[in-house]
Amino acid sequence: MNFLFCSVGRRGELIKNFKKSLNEDSKIIATDCNNTAPALYFADKQYIVPKITDDNYLSTIIDICKKEEIKAITTFIDPEIEILAKNRKLFEGIGVEVLAPYAETASLCFDKFKMYEYLVDKGVKTVKTYGDFESFRIDYENEACTLPVFVKPRTGSGSVGARKIDNYEELKGICYNERDLIIQEFMDGNDLDVDVYI
């Protein structure tokens, strides 16, 4: 059984761990848009592909699946999860199982503010999050929230653009210069990331 791991980047240890769990007849094929992505070279075979935003990306991945007789596909980056999920039927049509949540779940998980609203609606205790500066400003002026805060892109991944802001004027400027940010109450403590593949 051959597996395709897309956008592998620096996650060589993850590929090594997957290889240990597979039988000797299984192969891991890896893709990335950057030929210097270290994790590529832990796989049994590598492909350099267009960026996920390229018009030819999906057809390139489909071609690899056919050529390498791929039975299951997944990705190591958040933005690509939704691409795989939305094209699940296309992959299933060539006998490839998409190892990703369904499109609705993928969309919800990728949009941090939608996820916040979902969690609040379900009664799950979560960090206070604002979808825009104006909402934050109202609470700030009413002393319902304080600085510092944590700002990050609403749909970002890999902590790109995420930062702590201590100053109100700096926050205001950032929010007016950069669109689609969320503002969260600052949570102090150890950061913990968990990736689960079942």
Predicted segments with their positions:
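Glycine-rich phosphate-binding loop signature in dinucleotide/nucleotide-binding domains
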Residues: I64-I70, E143-T146, N177-E178
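ATP-binding N-terminal substructure of ATP-dependent carboxylate-amine bond-forming enzymes
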Residues: M1-L99
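Short, charged, surface-exposed secondary-structure boundary motifs
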Residues: A39-Y41, Y57-S59, S107-D111, S159-A162
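Short acidic-hydrophobic, aromatic-tinged amphipathic segments that line or gate anion-handling sites
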Residues: Q46-I52, K128-E134, R163-D166
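Phosphate-binding site of ATP-dependent enzymes
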Residues: R163-I198
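Glycine-/Pro-rich loop/turn segments that contact NAD(P) or position catalytic residues
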Residues: E104-T129, E134, I138-A144
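Short loop/helix-cap segments at secondary-structure boundaries that form the rim of catalytic
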Residues: A37-A43, I138-A144, G173-N177
